Amino acid sequence: MVYKVFLSLCIGLALSASAALHAQKAVSGHAPIQVETPARSSGQKHVLQLVTPKLETVRIGIIGLGMRGPGAVERFSKIPGTQIVALCDVLPERVKKTQEILVKAGLPEAAAYSGSEDAWKKLCEREDIDLVYIVTDWKTHAEMGVYAMEHGKHAAIEVPAAMTLEEIWKLIDTSERTRKHCIQLENCVYDFFELTTLNMAHQGVFGEILHAEGAYIHNLEDFWPYYWNNWRLDYNRKHRGDVYATHGMGPACQLLDIHRGDRMKTIVAMDTKAVNGPAYIKNKTGEVVADFQNGDQTTSLIRTEKGKTLLIQHNVMTPRPYSRKYQAVGTDGFADKYPLEMYCLRPAQVDSDIAPDHEKLNAHGPVSEEVKKALMEKYKHPIHRELEETAKKVGGHGGMDYIMDYRLIYCLRNGLPLDMDVYDLAEWCCLAELSRISIENGSAPVAIPDFTRGNWDKVKGYRHAMAE
């Protein structure tokens, strides 16, 4: 009897194990959810490494003079080879106030456009503008960028430049068709730790980079009232997924040479329930919101074509220290920016002139502060060697905004490929829709389009263009 029970139990366990294995194979065999990749129109070509005729003076029109636009005017007034031709905002008083920045800098006032939500179109239609610089709310970014390029202008668009795949493809197709630059104004790729770490990666200090992390973790509770017509909180209320991924994505993708030798292939995302968003609205207005879409925290995991991974987080709702989570994991080393900047390296990866006593280095803890400073000085990026002092004086998120604008103008004046192209824009913005699709399908994997449409491996590694 005991033997029969034992035999029955063994058979049952075997059948259960077989069923579990079969289920696992079935799940692992599921193809990722596919999204459409529109065919490239006949005669249209990619804009990888796009160069355009040199501009001795870059004539600029700026749309949006709220939280960020006036700072851009201030920075451009200090960058050689620029001219602010036109300013635009719905509110006339913002245009008038921003004109004071030009006057204070000893520059002529710009043409003014205001009083209408369509006034920006007149700015784009001017024939004396080379670059339209767009710093408005998210929902208007892509439309303005497309319109600017269609009217013969390069487009520089604040993050995120596009919120849907449809908007992304419109920007790509317009840039390819018009042969105009379309750059997303992602400033975090120019921050000092990030750019130094990128240079270290290029020099092989970390070995092969296998994994990178990024995030936007910033409690915006005190800032919600300052967004015009409550647009930002309203967007989070209506949209699920990582709606603001670019600050984390940009530096991480540059580390992994995305569309410069590798490409993002699949994404899996999940989120928490929404708690603090609806609570904030109830506290401020008394309204009970039962369908607030954006979870307090959203996490996305991405696999690349060459077997590397990215982890991206979004949280603007809970009280946490500010963090962009910048992290690089290599075969021979590690970099981490938050909460404390640190490097962890094999002793062999550190030159003896930096750390003469190798016994004090190991791969289980960070290098000393002294060694870290020496590494950051040794591998300081050439862009920082040129611009760091001025950038910190001018300011703009500690100087990285100035470097971003300077590099944009530098490349346009020298006829060089920009530091970021329209495919970077696409890759860093696509999480807004793709993470939502994954979440709404039980965190299923979603295929990430090849926004270069077959050209992701043509450029060998990410580098900044420099004039000879």
UniProtKB/Swiss-Prot annotation:
Q: Which UniProt keywords apply?
A: Glycosidase, Hydrolase, NAD, Signal
**Coiled coil where?**
none
UniProt signal peptide: 1-19
> If you read the UniProt record, what top EC class would you report for this enzyme, in one word?
hydrolase
Task: Quote the record's binding site residues for NAD(+).
Answer: M67, R68, D89, W138, K139, T140, H141, E158, V159, N187, Y244
The prosthetic group or cofactor this protein requires is: NAD(+)
Q: Does the keyword Signal apply?
A: yes
Q: Write down a Pfam family by its short name.
A: Glyco_hydro_109_C
State the similarity comment. Belongs to the Gfo/Idh/MocA family. Glycosyl hydrolase 109 subfamily.
* Job description of the protein: Glycosidase.
Q: What protein name is recorded for this chain? A: Glycosyl hydrolase family 109 protein
- Give the organism the record lists: Porphyromonas gingivalis (strain ATCC BAA-308 / W83)
